[in-house]
Amino acid sequence: MSKEYLFTSESVSEGHPDKVADQVSDGVLDAILATDPQARVACETLVSTGLVVISGEITTTAHPNYREIAQEVIRRIGYDNSDIGFDYKSCAVLAAINRQSADIAQGVNEGEGLDLDQGAGDQGLMFGYACNETPSLIPLPIYYAHRIMQRQSELRKDGRLNWLRPDAKSQLTVRYVDGKPVAIDTVVVSTQHSPEVSHAQITELVIEEIIKPVLPSALMQGEVRYLINPTGRFVIGGPHGDCGLTGRKIIVDTYGGAAHHGGGAFSGKDPSKVDRSAAYAGRWVAKNIVAAGLADRCEVQVAYAIGVARPVSMMIETFGTGRITDEKIVELVQRHFDLRPKAIIQELNLLRPIYGKTAAYGHFGRDEPEFTWEATDKAAALRADAGL
């Protein structure tokens, strides 16, 4: 008997207040890494009506202009007029920055601390995931939820739908049969808009110009329910409508709820923080396992102790889809991947100003060259070593 269920994932636009905060934090990180690749950065941002607050622990030889960084990020997003609730030209930017704790630095710096290798920047557990539902080996609901939001941004910025404003959310419910996506059940889009456009106009144009051009027609053969701005009005939005904070969209950033999450956010953190670098490495490992044909679905967990280089544990789960045992896959991963922080940073070339692009529309399932953790460069070797 087949198993049928509905699964839902959501995405948010670059103008969502939490994503504004993420982009400011990663904007600071990129500005620092551009001149000081060895900097230690843990940057948190709060955005509210007319206000940006940047805080955290940063040790660097760079001299970032926090106000200019924040204003440029906000301008690029599209908050350029107080009429839409936020204006990069007039918002206040406050910065309260400390240096990284010397006790933490001792455990992370290579050649210091009890472990002379570069240790993990903190304890914690991280997950990576991949599946063969889409060409990018990312779950289908989150993949298309992101595409809807990217389409909203595209039509807003090029003026084709000039009543759109930056803040928006999407949600996609997909029907699965025996673990495979077979139909789209419900699409929810809430988008900020100018006050003169009617709800009927918004509904028609969002469905016809944003949703339908993005979603695969093969999954839309049945009756699809559309819920467009279901409150009826969304004029007040962005940081004026809701306070935004760095790290509040960790499920949007990853796999849309289709996989576990260790709890650590990404944005504003340099790659010595395993919350970020090890989660990227976990995705790299899982994607190569699926690309190699070792499994249809794969979840990888790694865990670290602060100041210790090697992971304290690694677990792989293939949900009954593996061509070989999960234990055998663990052995293959241990032979083909070095998951010490320094090795991850070197292998994935993470000491570069590449993080701004990650801060909206997902850290995974992307094809831009900066997303080195999306490479399937180990797949052939894994498959050969597995004897497949």
UniProtKB/Swiss-Prot annotation:
UniProt keyword list: ATP-binding, Cytoplasm, Magnesium, Metal-binding, Nucleotide-binding, One-carbon metabolism, Potassium, Transferase
Give me the residues that bind Mg(2+), please.
Answer: D18
Q: What is this protein called?
A: S-adenosylmethionine synthase
* Catalysed transformations (reactions): L-methionine + ATP + H2O = S-adenosyl-L-methionine + phosphate + diphosphate
Q: Could you name the domain of life of the organism this protein comes from? A: Bacteria
Task: Quote the InterPro entries the UniProt record gives.
Answer: ADOMET_SYNTHASE_CS, S-AdoMet_synt_C, S-AdoMet_synt_central, S-AdoMet_synt_N, S-AdoMet_synthetase, S-AdoMet_synthetase_sfam
User: What job does this protein perform?
Assistant: Catalyzes the formation of S-adenosylmethionine (AdoMet) from methionine and ATP. The overall synthetic reaction is composed of two sequential steps, AdoMet formation and the subsequent tripolyphosphate hydrolysis which occurs prior to release of AdoMet from the enzyme.
Q: Kind of enzyme, top EC level?
A: transferase
- GO cellular component terms given for this protein: cytoplasm
Q: Which PANTHER family match?
A: S-ADENOSYLMETHIONINE SYNTHETASE (PTHR11964)
Naturally occurring in which organism (per UniProt): Aromatoleum aromaticum (strain DSM 19018 / LMG 30748 / EbN1) (Azoarcus sp. (strain EbN1))
Subunit record text: Homotetramer; dimer of dimers.
